[in-house]
Each structure stands twice: as C-alpha cells, then as structure tokens.
C-alpha cells in the first residue's frame, strides 16, 4: 500500500510537469533551473505558447488580438473643420469622391451652431458694405488718376467722365458764341397785335434783307393744358391779351441794322411797334425811364399819351405776368433823346387812372448790384453831412476843424479844475 501511494504521487508530479513544463518557478525550486529553459520558451510554437499557463510563458508570450481595434479620428480635426470658411469647405467637397459627398454634407450641416451662423452672416454683411464703399470711392475719385492705387479700369472710367465734361463745356461755349453772333442779326419787335402772323411780319421787313426765321413770344394760351408753342401754332390765345412780341432773325447783320428804321411805325390801328436790336442794351438805359405804381390793366397807348409832352417816344414796355398776361404794375418808356428823360422825371407823383406814378431813371441791374456790393461807391456818392467847412462862428471867423486843438481844449479844462484849488490856499494864507 505504501508503495502504491508513492507511485501515485510520482505519477501526479509527472503529470503536473507535463502540463507545465515551462514553469520553472512554480513546479521546481530555483536550484533545478536548467540552461536554455528561457530560450526554449521564447522560440516555441504557437500551440505550446497558447497552451502554457505559467508566469514565465505569460510574460514572454505575444498573443494576437482576436478583435481589431476601431480607429477614431482625432478631435482636433473636427475643430478645424468647424473653423474653416465656407469657401474652403466648398473646395474640399468638390475634391472628395461623389460617393462620400452626401454623408459628409449632412455632418457639416449638423455641426454648424447658431453662433457660427451669426458669424457667417456678419462676415457677408461686412463684405457687402466694403463693396458699397469701393463703389462710392470710385465715383468720388475723379481727380486722383495719378495715384498708384487706382486701377487701370477705374482710370479709364474717370478719363471718360472728364472727357464728357470737357466736351459739354466746349459745346456750351460754342453755343454761346453762336447765340451772340445770332443776336447781332436778330431784331426785337414789340407791341404787335394778336392777329399778326409770320407772313405779315415777313412782308413788313422783307425790303431790308432776307429773313431766316420768325419767333413769336409772350403768348398766353387760352387753355391751361396747352403749351405756348401749340398756342402760337393753333392761335389759341387768351381773349384778354391784346399784344404780343416777336424776334426776327436776318441772314446778314447789315439787314438787321437797317430794319431799325421801322421803329415807331404803325403796323395796325393803335399799335405802334418798337424795333430794337436784341444785343443792344447799354444805350437803352440812358434814354429810358422806369415807371412804377401803374394800374394792372393799363395799356401801352395810355402810358404813351401820358409822356407825349416830354418828347418823341420810341417804345413803351409793360412788364406782364408770363402765365396770366396781366401787368405787374411797372414798365419802361424809351425816348429818342436823353433830354426827354429830364422832362419825364418831373412827372413823378403825377396821376394816371387814379394812381400816382413813380418815375425814376432806368438803371442797369448789374451796375446797381455792384454799387450795393461795394460800400466805397456808396460813400463816394453820398458825402458826409457832419463836416461843414464853410460854417462860421458868431464873430465871423471860420471854425478850426483841427482835431488836436479840440483835444487841447479838453485838457485845459482839466487843468482849470486843478487851478480852482489854488485860490483857496491863497485865502487861507491871507
């Protein structure tokens, strides 16, 4: 029995050694270590390494993982994607394959927050504001073509605008010169009857030269909807209007000067026309008189009769409203000579149709404005009233206007006040 027990123990030990042959630490003490035991455990087959359960085998065994690890993207990349601009995202989406586009677009939309949307809106608003400012600067920089920052296209636009402005100025200057030359060939004809037309007027002036054109002015249409041009063509004139004016343009300047002979002639009963050059204004001021406080319904014939005694009258003009044709209450009388003007000034405060007239010399508006603007001219025309050089004293001697003497007199008065204290001292001494 004892032998059988010993054999059983030996068998158990051998079985344990067969199950764990590599485990030199557990099964055998450190004195039983054999050379090459570690190397043999390292270079053994897979089935031996998997089957071993000892400590040494577990340390040096390299077991392959049965499940492969799942690779998760780094969180930094997601942060960069959120901070990218819309343009970079669009370019990256174009480069990606078509199969991956829809899934990633959905992710990008989900990742955008409200704050990011607000930032994008602000950036777009700032970009639009910058564009508007650039447009305004381009319009305002007409004189800054020489700057290096200006683009070539902008310079071309500015040059074109300057060229148009210069061309318009040249056209205006040319038109002014043409009008000036045309005015020298033009004759003003006033106080024409309403029934007068172009044929009658041309036949009246045809003996002096060829007529280029005839224009009627100071027409008042019968209806408010009609223009003056249509009223002149259709002859639909206001019934209260009795006279009109016209301009006759000759082809030669000599013909216009000869046509002045018709000034004062009667073209119809009660209508004495006045003829004058359109360019002549200076000589008219010296021979004309301003008449104010006129009745509103007065006619030229009544004013002419009132000033007949002063001399031969060349023309009478009443200033009327352009829309209604009613007189504004003042007018002008043009005489043949300047001597008649002195006689007409004596008719100041004379009555006409129950109104006292105000008669004055006719003054050029430009000269009158210059006198008002220059105070020196006013002082020259009006001498000071305070200085009378011919005034005399009661003794008959002229007064001395030397300012220094007056100042000395004032000083002597002050000295006299001081002297007034001296006799008091003398009285005390006495």
From Swiss-Prot:
The chain residues annotated with the modification N6-acetyllysine are: 151
Q: Where is this cross-link: Glycyl lysine isopeptide (Lys-Gly) (interchain with G-Cter in SUMO2)?
A: 242
What name appears for this protein in its UniProt entry?
A: RNA-binding protein 34
Q: Is Zinc-finger there in the keyword field?
A: no
Renumbered to this chain, region (Disordered) spans 1-55, 72-123, 134-153, 365-395, 411-430
**Protein family membership:** Belongs to the RRM RBM34 family.
Q: Where in the cell is it found?
A: Nucleus, Nucleolus
This protein's GO cellular component annotations are: chromosome; nucleolus; nucleoplasm
The species is: Homo sapiens (Human)
The lineage's top-level taxon is: Eukaryota
| Basic and acidic residues composition-biased segments | 23-34, 113-123
Provide the GO MF annotations for this entry: RNA binding
**Which controlled-vocabulary keywords does the entry list?**
Acetylation, Isopeptide bond, Nucleus, Phosphoprotein, Repeat, RNA-binding, Ubl conjugation
């Amino acid at each position: 029995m004892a032998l059988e027990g010993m054999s059983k123990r030996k068998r158990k030990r051998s079985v344990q050694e067969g199950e764990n042959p590599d485990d030199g630490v557990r099964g055998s003490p450190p004195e039983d270590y054999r050379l090459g035991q570690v190397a043999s455990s390292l270079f053994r087959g897979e089935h031996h390494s998997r089957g071993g359960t000892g400590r040494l085998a577990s340390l040096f065994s390299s077991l392959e993982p049965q499940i492969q690890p799942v690779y998760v993207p780094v969180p930094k990349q997601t942060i960069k994607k959120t901070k990218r601009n819309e343009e970079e995202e669009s370019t990256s989406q174009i480069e990606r394959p078509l199969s991956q586009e829809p899934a990633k677009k959905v992710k990008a939309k989900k990742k955008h927050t409200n704050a990011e949307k607000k930032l994008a809106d602000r950036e777009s608003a700032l970009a639009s504001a910058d564009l508007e400012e650039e447009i305004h600067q381009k319009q305002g920089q007409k004189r800054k073509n020489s700057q290096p920052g200006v683009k070539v296209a902008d310079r071309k636009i500015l040059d074109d605008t300057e060229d148009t402005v210069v061309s318009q100025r040249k056209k205006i200057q040319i038109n002014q010169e043409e009008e000036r030359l045309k005015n020298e060939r033009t004759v003003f004809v006033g106080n024409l009857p309403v029934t007068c037309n172009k044929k009658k007027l041309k036949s009246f002036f045809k003996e002096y030269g060829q007529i280029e054109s005839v224009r009627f002015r100071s027409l008042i249409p019968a209806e408010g909807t009609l223009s003056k041009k249509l009223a002149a063509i259709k002859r639909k004139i206001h019934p209260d209007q009795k006279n009109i004016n016209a301009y006759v343009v000759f082809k030669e300047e000599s013909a216009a000067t000869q046509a002045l002979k018709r000034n004062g002639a009667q073209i119809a009963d009660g209508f004495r026309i006045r003829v004058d050059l359109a360019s002549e204004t200076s000589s008219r001021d010296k021979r004309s008189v301003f008449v104010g406080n006129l009745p509103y319904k007065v006619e030229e014939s009544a004013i002419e009769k009132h000033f007949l005694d002063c001399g031969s009258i060349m023309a009478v003009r009443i200033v009327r409203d352009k829309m209604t044709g009613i007189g504004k209450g003042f007018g002008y009388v043009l005489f043949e000579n300047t001597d008649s003007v002195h006689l007409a000034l004596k008719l100041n405060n004379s009555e006409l149709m129950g109104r006292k007239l105000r008669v004055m010399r006719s003054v050029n508006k430009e000269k009158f404005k210059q006198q008002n603007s220059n105070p020196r001219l006013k002082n020259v025309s009006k001498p000071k009233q305070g200085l009378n050089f011919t005034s005399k004293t009661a003794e008959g001697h002229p007064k001395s206007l030397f300012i220094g003497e007056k100042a000395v007199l004032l000083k002597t008065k002050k000295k006299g006040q001081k002297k007034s204290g001296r006799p008091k001292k003398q009285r005390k001494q006495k």
